[in-house]
Each structure stands twice: as structure tokens, then as C-alpha cells.
């Protein structure tokens, strides 16, 4: 006898339903998802985008940095485009000079004179005896554009005065036997907050000296709190620069080859190689035997000139080779690559590579943007120059060559650059004089902006 299965039904009253949690009373719904709504997150929309880490401190290791420096130095030595861009980046900025701004005006005058007397002499200011204040800034800016950074060690001379010793980026290394577990990364030791506490300076292959951070300056562009070292201005332009150099090299080789050949002798189709019938061994018809050719050519000197007349066999012709490379498409492509290089530096391509393409209105706008770019670069440089300025004046006061300042804030200083770039000094000068006359502008500031230091 089969037992019947009982069916149980769950019956709940309205009161029971009211006592249940509110979430159970609601119908179930899927969590909202974009499902590819953000186009930049679609992995199949483009080719492979290789970026293996999101840790800022690990974006570049020692190998990557060395590879970028080698490529950038190669381009600087062998590419006129890159060499000119690096030099123009410095020339557009120019050097900056200090003006003491303490409340002790007499001390300001003496401090400026003592500072300039010290830094104007390479023998007294630079350990190697090669760099003065202005040439030091030019060297540091060019090295930073190529290598990404450099190290300035604050030193003391035999007379007790302030000196500096500069070292290029490859000299900044991690001491042997130390690594990230010891706080070292790419030649810099940082504390738990990411603040540099020491630098590793290579003195000989396999030997390293540890320099306290208080005695050194890591001169770099766009300092990032999460990134230990600076990046080259050319880091985005490495492949573009190599491509331009290769295109120029191949084009030059083709032009030289075509110039070496010059002419090509041609012959009609009837005189070319035998056809398929002869190739497969067919017999020639009677009466169709080929006559032997006389390939000899005679050259005759034309009387009254140096030209030569070439005598060719019947049916032969000479054609000159004219090389049409680079084509307009290749020239336009190279121009696009140059624009990529300029944009990566932060400048308009017309400023670095094609200033003649600017009109008057566009030139004023680009010069205004250029001034902002120069100010941004100078803001970073002033931080480093402030430390050198304080180092020199502090040792001058300690040595007794400069009296003590009556103002406790003896470190106050203003920095003035070279004169501003302009294409219409007359119009801007007239406007400035009207503003000064009405008390809306400062005459000293305008003079420094137009004349510089």
C-alpha cells in the first residue's frame, strides 16, 4: 500500500507579514552595474594597454630609469631636433637672481653684494671650479631635461665659504646590500612618511657614500610626494625621436644611392630577355635568330665645353633617376611627431620647432601661455635656489665676512628672472607707463620684467 505524500503550504497572516524585516517584503533586484558604460574600462576596445602597477613609487625601477637615460642621451648627442628642444627649454626660462627682502635694508645691500661675489666665481663657488651661478642653473636644467634629476651637495670651502658639488643622475644609486626593506628606492632613503632622509652617491664602481638629506638637494622637475625620483622631459619623446632619426637616416641613404647611380640604361620590350617558349626549351623559328648586340658605348668630348655625348645601341635609352623622398605624407607625419614632442614638454609646437608659422594674434596668446609655463618652472627652481642662497649667506655670516642681520627673518628673498619675452614692447610699454602714472602698477616691477637682472 502506497503512502500518500502530504503537501504542506506555508500560510502567514497579515500580522506575520507586518512583523518581517522590510527588506524581505521588497522584491529582489540585481545590484546596478555599468556593464561597459565606461568606455575607457573596456579591455577589448583597443589593443593591449600594458601598465602593470598602480603604485606610484614602483612605476619605474633602476632598469627602466637607466634605459630612458641612455636613450635620451643618445638622442641629445645625435638628433639636432632633440638637442635644439633641450636647449630651447632652458633659453625660454633663463636664470633667476635673488634680491634680499628683509627689514634691514643696509644688510640687504651687503648680503646681495656678498652673495654675488661668491657665486660669480666658479673657483670659489663650485667644487670642480667650472660652474658659476648662471652656468650652474643652465647645467642643472639641461641635465634634468635629459636625465630627470641631478644631485647638488652643499659643501664648505677652505675659506669657510659656501660651495656646491653637482652630480648627474647615474651617480645616485642604492648602496650595495641595501634595498626597499631598508627604506631605499632608486638611490634615495625615505622615512615612513616618504620624506627623503639620505641619498646614495656612487664614488667608484661598487662603492657608495651616504649623504644626509639635510646636506643635499635632489634637483628634479614636478616633484611628486609618492615618486622618489624625477622623470626626463623626453620620456614621452624617446620613441618619436628615434623614429624621426631613423626616417632621416633611411631617406639620406636613399638620396645618396640615387645620386650615386644617376642614370639607368633602358631597352625596348623586343630586346628584353627571351619569352616563355625559349625558357621551356622550344626551338626558334628559322629567320628569327637574334643578332648579337654591340654593347660598346663611345664617349665624345663636345668642343667648347665639358659635356659628354653618349652613343647608345639602337633602341636603347638613358633615364635619369630623380629621388622624390621624403614624400609630402612623410613630411607631414614627421611634423606630427614633432608636435607630440612639444606638447609633452608643455609647449606649443610653434614655439619649439616652427615659430615662423605664428601670426600676430596667435603669437600673443602663445606668449601668454609661455609666460605661465615659465612661471611654473621657476616656482619649482626657486625652492632649490632658496636652499643654496641660505647656505651661502649663512656661511658668509659665520666666517665674519657678512654682518649679522638685524631682522630675524634673514632668509626672506625675492627671485627675479630675465626679461619677459614680448613681440610688442612699444604697446605694452605705453600701457605700463599709463598704469604707473595712475598708480595702478609698480615701476620697479615693470622695470625688472622688461630689463631683467
Q: What does each of the following model-derived ranges do?
A:
Residues 1-100:
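N-terminal-proximal low-complexity accessory segments that begin disordered
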Residues 103, 131-136, 155-168, 272-283, ...:
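Charge-rich, acidic-biased intrinsically disordered regions
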Residues 105, 127, 306-425:
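Surface-exposed loop-to-helix/strand elements on domain peripheries
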Residues 131, 154-156, 254-259, 351-356, ...:
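Short coil/turn segments at secondary-structure boundaries
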Residues 220-365:
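Extended, charged amphipathic alpha-helical segments
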Residues 422-453:
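Charged substrate- and nucleic-acid-binding regions of tRNA-handling and nucleotidyl-transfer enzymes
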Amino acid at each position: 500500500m502506497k503512502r500518500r505524500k502530504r503537501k504542506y503550504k506555508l500560510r502567514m497572516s497579515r500580522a506575520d507579514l507586518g512583523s518581517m524585516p522590510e527588506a524581505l517584503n521588497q522584491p529582489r533586484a540585481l545590484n546596478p552595474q555599468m556593464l561597459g558604460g565606461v568606455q575607457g574600462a573596456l579591455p577589448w576596445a583597443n589593443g593591449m594597454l600594458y601598465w602593470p602597477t598602480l603604485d606610484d613609487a614602483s612605476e619605474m625601477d633602476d632598469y627602466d630609469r637607466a634605459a630612458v637615460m641612455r636613450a635620451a642621451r643618445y638622442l641629445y648627442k645625435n638628433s639636432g631636433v632633440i638637442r635644439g628642444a633641450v636647449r630651447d627649454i632652458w633659453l625660454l626660462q633663463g636664470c633667476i637672481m635673488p634680491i634680499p627682502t628683509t627689514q634691514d635694508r643696509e644688510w640687504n645691500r651687503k648680503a646681495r653684494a656678498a652673495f654675488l661675489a661668491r657665486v660669480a666665481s666658479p673657483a670659489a663657488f663650485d667644487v670642480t671650479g667650472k660652474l658659476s651661478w648662471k652656468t650652474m642653473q643652465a647645467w642643472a636644467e639641461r641635465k634634468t631635461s635629459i636625465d630627470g634629476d641631478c644631485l647638488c651637495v652643499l659643501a664648505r670651502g677652505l675659506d669657510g665659504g659656501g660651495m656646491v658639488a653637482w652630480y648627474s643622475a647615474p651617480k645616485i644609486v642604492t648602496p650595495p646590500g641595501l634595498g626597499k626593506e631598508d627604506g631605499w628606492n632608486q638611490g634615495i632613503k625615505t622615512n615612513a612618511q616618504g620624506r627623503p632622509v639620505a641619498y646614495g652617491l656612487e664614488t667608484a664602481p661598487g662603492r657608495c657614500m651616504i649623504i644626509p638629506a639635510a646636506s643635499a638637494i635632489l634637483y628634479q622637475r614636478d616633484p611628486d610626494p609618492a615618486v622618489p625620483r624625477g622623470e626626463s622631459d623626453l620620456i614621452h619623446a624617446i620613441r618619436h625621436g628615434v623614429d624621426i632619426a631613423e626616417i632621416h637616416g633611411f631617406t639620406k641613404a636613399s638620396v645618396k644611392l640615387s645620386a650615386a647611380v644617376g642614370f639607368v640604361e633602358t631597352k625596348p620590350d623586343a630586346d628584353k630577355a627571351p619569352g616563355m617558349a625559349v625558357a621551356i626549351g622550344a626551338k626558334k623559328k628559322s629567320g628569327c635568330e637574334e643578332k648579337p648586340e654591340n654593347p660598346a658605348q663611345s664617349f665624345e668630348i663636345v668642343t667648347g665645353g665639358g659635356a659628354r655625348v653618349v652613343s647608345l645601341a639602337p633602341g636603347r635609352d638613358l633615364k635619369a633617376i630623380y629621388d622624390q623622398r621624403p614624400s609630402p605624407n612623410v613630411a607631414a607625419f614627421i611634423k606630427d611627431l614633432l608636435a607630440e614632442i612639444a606638447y609633452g614638454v608643455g609647449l606649443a609646437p610653434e614655439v619649439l620647432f616652427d615659430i615662423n608659422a605664428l601670426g600676430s594674434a596667435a603669437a600673443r596668446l602663445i606668449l601668454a601661455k609661455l609666460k605661465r609655463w615659465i612661471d611654473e618652472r621657476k616656482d619649482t627652481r626657486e625652492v632649490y635656489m632658496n636652499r643654496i642662497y641660505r647656505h651661502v649667506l649663512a656661511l658668509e655670516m659665520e666666517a665674519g665676512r657678512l654682518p649679522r642681520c638685524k631682522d630675524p627673518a634673514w632668509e626672506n628673498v625675492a627671485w627675479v628672472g630675465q626679461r619677459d619675452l614680448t613681440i610688442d614692447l612699444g604697446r605694452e610699454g605705453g600701457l605700463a607707463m599709463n598704469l604707473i602714472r595712475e598708480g595702478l602698477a609698480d615701476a620697479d616691477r615693470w622695470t625688472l620684467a622688461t630689463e631683467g637682472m
